[in-house]
Amino acid sequence: MKKRWSILSAVLCVALLTGGCGTGSKNDAGTGKEQTFRHETREGNEHQSNLDVLQPSAYGNVQGLNLEKGSSISIIGRGSSSAYWKAVQEGAKQAVADINTNLGYKGNDKVKLVYSAPETENDVDDQVNILDEELARYPVAVGIAAVDSGACEVQFDLAAENGIPIVAFDSGTDYQNIVSMIDTDNTTAAATAASKLCNSIGESGQILVIAHDSKSTSSEEREQGFVQEVEKNDPNVTVAEIWHLDDLDAISKEINADSSEKNSQETADNVQKAEEENADSRDTQTAQQDAIKYLLEKYPDVKGIFATNETVADLVVNVLDSMDKTTGEDRIKVVSFDGGEDQMKLLEDGKIDGLIVQNPYGIGYATVVACARAVLGQGNEATVSTGYTWVTKDNMNKDSIKKMLY
């Protein structure tokens, strides 16, 4: 097994005190274009169509991945409760199951998978602590969807010193020694969303961008890809404001400065409460919805909203419902990333106009394959593209689309 980490305890104590953060340049986005998952499946895996679109195709199978008996792979996500993250887990589990079947491993000989994620989605400190715990278990490889692209450098250095490769998936990291990045081409996908939204509002007017956080590369790439497309091809459309769900403190100060009216003060109080150290998820969700409502009141002429993931989309639709802006003449158009069951219902009900549906199952599967390839010294592509497609109410019931929903 790997050599013991004689410096582990001391260094991790320092990491906890300093926050374990580092800086560097962002990983480049992938190059995959919009794809529709094929309807055909191979015997034994109903999700084979999710694997057929992976580029390169080698990441859609486990042939030649002869891992040692009892090997353990750690996969660390940014969440675990949403449909997206459940699909990532499912894909990763299937890859490990395929490895065990292919090698004939049973019982204690099986290759093992441990999936972990912050209790509260996108909790940076919790994810860093999880990474510490997983590294202490001596996995053969780690796959991580980094909440904060600048965090975990100390932990990654420790992993490198002990021969544990790190694969990034979904959202990249600034760390320079990542062996592969498994993700959607967020920049291109967001540009597709921008083009569709601008077209739906008549290529003129104001729109808002609501992003899931200000730290992850997935959020940054989607934001940039969307804005760049608008600026390049839709000169009569204006991005009125970009707001991140974790920017509650800044918007609280703005609300307080903007008005002393009762409703605005209540909104500011809710936002401030969510910023408190022990605030629960309900406080945070209420504050985020209040902030979105404030932005819509600040920009009364907004005609469309881009939500960068399903969490944001749910918040946006809840607010629009409360303001009677999901139907009728005052309806505000919404496009979003992700395609879980709840979002498909919103799409069917006409409360969301279009979705960039990713391939989380393929992301999970390919991440395990990349981890195994790294362990075996087989080499990896710097970027593995997992595909996406544009889904609307008009095409959501097509067989080729249904195969990629989660």
PLM region spans:
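N-terminal non-cleavable signal-anchor helices
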Residues: 12-15, 272
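C-terminal motif of bacterial Sec signal peptides marking the signal peptidase cleavage site
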Residues: 16-20
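A residue-level marker of the well-folded mature domains of exported/periplasmic proteins
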Residues: 3, 22-406
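Positively charged n-region of N-terminal signal peptides that target proteins for export
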Residues: 1-12
